[in-house]
Amino acid sequence: MSGASARSLGKGSAPPGPVPEGQIRVYSMRFCPFAQRTLMVLKAKGIRHEIININLKNKPEWFFEKNPFGLVPVLENTQGHLITESVITCEYLDEAYPEKKLFPDDPYEKACQKMTFELFSKVPSLVTSFIRAKRKEDHPGIKEELKKEFSKLEEAMANKRTAFFGGNSLSMIDYLIWPWFQRLEALELNECIDHTPKLKLWMATMQEDPVASSHFIDAKTYRDYLSLYLQDSPEACDYGL
């Protein structure tokens, strides 16, 4: 089965056939923020695509031929070419399908987006540390670190004086960082942005974007998924289906 809401393929499953003509395939997982980056770029650019969900707690043997690390997202085109790593997949899509560019053409503006992305670079690992922290006493320290990182982004937004990180319209940088902001409420980390009014305004604007909002997962569903995932349950990736 394929599609955003299709059940995931696990150990013992048959590998999918060739990628349909005129499409590109993405190997994904419904709750993965890294895969969400790629899915949002596909949707924002209007690229016809096929979604194959992978059970990351019960990975199919054949999937390691697509990515030796066994991680999503992975892109596969009709030539059988494979592209891994979320940021690389997004940049590939922007160049391979140039009709609606998400990165700016101007080299300096593109460099500015990449520099802003570096300001965000510690956030995913800090969020993962928070999720995996076995002792509640460790949470305040991680939250303080997150507040520092969000302060850097608040300053960048203040200096930019635009609605989005790349200007007055949505662009690649906004999609690359959005999945982690979207999960703050579910993770009960909203307090980490209490001191960043411009970031909060940006988040409210992002929630109105049809591409960003199409990947909305309600807080309870996400928390229930996480509970199963942290128990290494093979049912985690298909939770709610």
From Swiss-Prot:
Glutathione binds at residues 59, 72, 85-86. Residues 106-228 form the GST C-terminal domain. The modification N6-acetyllysine is found at residues 57, 143, 148, 152. Gene3D superfamilies: 1.20.1050.10, Glutaredoxin. It is found in: Cytoplasm, Cytosol. Exhibits glutathione-dependent thiol transferase and dehydroascorbate reductase activities. Has S-(phenacyl)glutathione reductase activity. Also has glutathione S-transferase activity. Participates in the biotransformation of inorganic arsenic and reduces monomethylarsonic acid (MMA) and dimethylarsonic acid. Its main location: cytoplasm. Residues 22-101 form the GST N-terminal domain. The modification N-acetylserine is found at residue 2. GO terms for cellular component: axon; basement membrane; cell body; cytoplasm; cytosol; nuclear membrane. It catalyses: RX + glutathione = an S-substituted glutathione + a halide anion + H(+); L-dehydroascorbate + 2 glutathione = glutathione disulfide + L-ascorbate; methylarsonate + 2 glutathione + H(+) = methylarsonous acid + glutathione disulfide + H2O. PROSITE patterns: GST_CTER (PS50405), GST_NTER (PS50404). SUPFAM superfamilies: GST C-terminal domain-like, Thioredoxin-like. One of its GO terms (molecular function) is glutathione dehydrogenase (ascorbate) activity. This is Glutathione S-transferase omega-1. The keyword Acetylation applies. Homodimer.
